[in-house]
């Protein structure tokens, strides 16, 4: 099948096969056909989000060496970037959250390292929730959790979570594919919306691996999917593998959008860039505090972007902005029509396996 036939399938609302996704991923990032893929992804993203992009903002409640062995992460003890543990006070956490709320972030994310005590995370979260407006969307970015803990997150006032099955999970990490998937499904069972991503993409990942991960993220109807490249942590073993270009990342962002059902409104990329936005990304993150892609303890002094900078990148890419609580994490008002559309997509996806 040629590229135009695949794009015509997308325009008709048909589910792309894994072979279709591999075909699109196999194009040279700078060839004319890839720019056609960008245009189609941009069209879909603007259609499902009414042309309005979102900026979410994340702060870390702690910084500590972690034993989960994620080779791409600056928190990993094996990488030796950070050697001491630090934790925000309740007041500092509330201040960060209010800062993001005041700057107009569409969702406020609380992140912890994977082994941070869950009950302590909840204690901080409850103070943060009390300090925010009721309508502010609060999201958790935590390690794998049981269904019981997922319910506690929901009860504490979280609308959703960010959670991903990472590329080569269990090879480049000490975690298992099964534990990551179980957490995703437990979060959903608890009533939390789940945002995810195809990440962290490196030069070594094959088009078949990427297509399989795109299909997996589509399979559970996330709040958003998307793609993010691996950022090299200086001095680490995995940094020797190199990094993909922003253009290649934008290509993967675009193909991921084409692989999602249109019930998925969001299409993310990280780190924020105009190429990603042109290729259909409608979600960026601002960050403060610890950041798993940064060697600075305060990423606002390193790689982290601000809410305003993220907005400017979108505007430079001809996106309008959404003001108000995140639509990606608050899909309930459209649940009935979404369920019907999702059922059709899911059935088509299963029939192609």
Range-by-range predicted roles:
Residues 61, 77-184, 193-200, 223-226:
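Core AdoMet radical
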